[in-house]
Amino acid sequence: MSRIGLRPIEIPQGVEVKIDEKNFAVVKGPKGTLEQQLSKDMEIKIEENVINVVRPTDNKKHKSLHGLTRTLLSNMVEGVTKGYEKKLELVGVGYRANKQGDKLVLTLGFSHPIEMVDPEGITVEVPSQTEIFVKGINKQVVGNYAAKIRELRKPEPYKGKGVKYANEVIRRKVGKTGK
């Protein structure tokens, strides 16, 4: 039984949700518009200011799609109202981040600086040289872009150098013991 799928989604004031007969969802809000094709097996009901997702049967596939569909809709509604944000930190001597127009320029100890162009719908802020904020309305795109930045230089376990999420805890290892 999908407990997440059973929870109703409340539609806040100023958000407009449209779902056609093929389960193509369009959510408009103060921050923007999101569109996504949802599973055709699920039945999505909009009554007053509440969205309910109903599954047709109790087989395993429908149970998993039930929770997924509800979560995707909930993320869309939250994205157009509040938006999403990931904070990254650069740890290490000489590790820096700069913003040049729509490019993020990272100096991560390689022989060359790395330039990354911001994807559409994403804003990147660099308040200091060691902090990066990735913001947007689509949770998936924000998370993927933050993961791409982190992938360039993952934190290593000995000194903790690298690009890490702000709330990430790096398990440290003990180095070699000298004679």
Swiss-Prot record:
> PROSITE patterns from the entry?
RIBOSOMAL_L6_1 (PS00525)
Give the UniProt record's GO annotations in the biological process aspect: cytoplasmic translation
- The source's superkingdom equals Bacteria
Q: Kindly list the cysteine pairs connected by disulfide bridges.
A: none
One GO term describing the cellular component: cytosolic large ribosomal subunit
Q: Which UniProt keywords apply?
A: Ribonucleoprotein, Ribosomal protein, RNA-binding, rRNA-binding
Query: MF terms per GO, please?
Result: rRNA binding; structural constituent of ribosome
Under InterPro entries, the record lists: Ribosomal_uL6-like (IPR000702), Ribosomal_uL6-like_a/b-dom_sf (IPR036789), Ribosomal_uL6_a/b-dom (IPR020040), Ribosomal_uL6_bac-type (IPR019906), Ribosomal_uL6_CS (IPR002358)
Q: Which family does it belong to?
A: Belongs to the universal ribosomal protein uL6 family.
Please give the PANTHER family that the UniProt record associates with this protein. 60S/50S RIBOSOMAL PROTEIN L6/L9, LARGE RIBOSOMAL SUBUNIT PROTEIN UL6M
Q: Relate the protein's function as given in its record.
A: This protein binds to the 23S rRNA, and is important in its secondary structure. It is located near the subunit interface in the base of the L7/L12 stalk, and near the tRNA binding site of the peptidyltransferase center.
Q: Self-association or partners: how does it assemble?
A: Part of the 50S ribosomal subunit.
- Could you identify this protein by its name? Large ribosomal subunit protein uL6
Q: Report the source organism.
A: Alkaliphilus oremlandii (strain OhILAs) (Clostridium oremlandii (strain OhILAs))
